[in-house]
Amino acid sequence: DTDTSGLVIAARTDEAYAALRRQFRERKVLKEYVALVRGRTPEHGKLEHYLMHNPARRGQMIASSNATARKGLRPMRAITQYRRARIFEEYTLLNVVIRTGVTHQIRCQLAAAGFPIAGDKLYGGEDPLLARHFLHAAALTIEHPVGKERIRFEAPLPPDLRQTLALLA
């Protein structure tokens, strides 16, 4: 997602690229995010949906509890787990782990659960709190393409998201 901050991974060789693609395909990559959502979530949860492109709104996904697709739509399974990190008056800060990798997965699933991401105009409407959605790719754990050891990369929250949390505290 364009406005999502945080980690992006790149490979320097074709072999490393192939190894990373395999890890993503086999769901061996641990992808961790931080999200600020509107409302108060349960302490933890697991969201399981089938996501499809919304034919009525270009660039948006829709969530369904079953794999039955509307005509011309291809449902993709999405699994998201979250744990509450901090509660604010009208918002909740979450640590999120995705087990799959579908476009807009976190944004769409949290909105479908009734907890849209703060600042997310596509899935949550207007939010005066910030100019972009509060979703940050905080950590990524992979197997090194050559050495095979597990490596964890982390990215701290950027200044605008830290400032948003300071305003809420």
Task: Annotate each PLM feature.
Residues 2-169:
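RNA pseudouridine synthases
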